[in-house]
Regions:
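Conserved N-terminal alpha-helix of the aminotransferase class I/II PLP-enzyme fold
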Residues: 1-42, 56, 66-72, 78-80, ...
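PLP-dependent aminotransferase-like
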Residues: 55-112
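Conserved C-terminal alpha-helix-loop-beta "cap" of PLP-dependent enzymes
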Residues: 58, 250-335
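Hydrophobic beta-strand scaffold residues
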Residues: 86-87, 145-147, 289
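Active-site phosphate-binding strand-loop segment of PLP-dependent enzymes
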Residues: 95-149
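Distinct, well-ordered alpha-helical segments
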Residues: 102, 156-164
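Active-site C-terminal subdomain of aminotransferase-like
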Residues: 120, 125, 168-260, 269
Length: 336
């Protein structure tokens, strides 16, 4: 990082004001076809701010969130305890939600959030036409459509569309710079110039106007274009992996076909057993198969997440087959 800063004559920002920060905000906004952007220290703050502003602008505090929304699962009820907005659940917990789900709410809402892709259900994406139907309906009904785009870089590859194509029709977008991009942390909120100006005020009110953003921005900006260029390769490797998984009936991927370079694998074991197998394989074969298995709805079944990135790209095909062979044999032995 230090050498990159020296090579590019980077100077520190002061409370978010600095050439690098503004250049990076403009670069991402242009890529997504949005008017303006602001770098935010956390995605939690970015999304709560976006949805709060959407509600204030419509004098309606109701927001539609899928049951697997990060806001509901991982943010300690911030929307409720900090009095940002009220939540209505939308859609099937195990599927992307649709425009019919939106219509079925039966009451006016100010905003709806869509996560692209939906991490908690294996990186699923709505069909492209289904997403466009949601965009059209929200525009017609004056519903602020916000994207949780923490991993939208993956979504664009899954759709075979540009980032701008995916973002068009959303009133605001949040993106992350440590997921996929590999930065130290930080996020960006994008929208209209007026919306972002208001967001900056609210971020300052919440303690988000940190003195120096440069280290976070540098860690993302220095590798941003390179990481984006690698995303199609990750998706191609995922397609290859899905073909290989067809030969292992003990391993069930969700979704059934690749949507992005993220997937969940279901295996016929309790989570404790699967995690024990993971540890043993790591010790005996030097292969770390997954982070953590969690129990699924059915007894004796668990699932874990696979992210197809640099490590799986660098691993020889035969090495991947060996790892799956070892896992499949371990599952069979545990079932006896």
């Amino acid at each position: 990082m230090a050498q990159w800063c020296a090579d590019h004559q980077i100077a520190h920002d002061v409370y978010g004001e600095g050439a690098l920060v503004q250049q990076f905000e403009k670069q991402v906004a242009t890529m997504l076809g949005m008017e303006a952007a602001v770098f935010c220290i956390t995605g939690t703050m970015a999304q709560a701010t976006a949805l709060r502003l959407a509600c204030a602008g419509r004098s309606n505090r109701r927001v539609a969130l899928h049951p697997t929304s990060h806001i509901l699962k991982h943010e300690r009820s911030n929307f409720q305890l900090l009095d940002h907005f009220h939540v209505l659940h939308i859609g099937d917990p195990f599927r992307p939600w649709t425009v019919d789900d939106l219509k079925a709410l039966g009451e006016p809402i100010a905003a709806a959030q869509y996560e692209l892709p939906m991490r908690e259900i294996g990186g699923q994406l709505p069909a492209w036409d289904a997403l466009n139907a949601i965009k059209t309906y929200c525009r017609e009904q004056n519903i602020h459509l916000h994207m949780d785009g923490a991993r939208m870089w993956e979504a664009a590859c899954g759709y075979g569309k540009s980032l701008q194509d995916v973002a068009t029709g959303f009133d605001s977008v949040y993106v992350s710079f440590y997921k996929d991009i590999g930065g130290m942390g930080g996020s960006m909120l994008l929208g209209s110039a007026r919306f972002i100006a208001e967001a900056k005020i609210w971020m300052q009110r919440q303690g988000g106007n940190v003195f120096r953003r440069t280290p976070y921005v540098v860690s993302a900006a220095m590798q941003f274009e390179k990481r984006l260029a690698e995303m199609p390769t990750y998706f191609q490797r995922t397609v290859w992996l899905y073909e290989l998984l067809k030969t292992y009936p003990q391993l069930t991927p969700n979704p059934a076909t690749p949507h992005t370079n993220l997937l969940h694998l279901y295996v016929p074991l309790a989570a404790e057993t699967a995690n024990g197998i993971r540890n043993r394989i790591a010790k005996e074969h030097g292969i770390w198969l997954f982070g953590r298995a969690v129990n699924a709805a059915l007894p004796g079944q668990c699932m874990f997440e696979w992210y197809v990135g640099d490590q799986l790209l660098q691993m020889p095909d035969d090495g991947v087959r060996k790892a799956l062979d070892v896992l499949a044999k371990s599952i069979a032995a545990s079932a006896k």
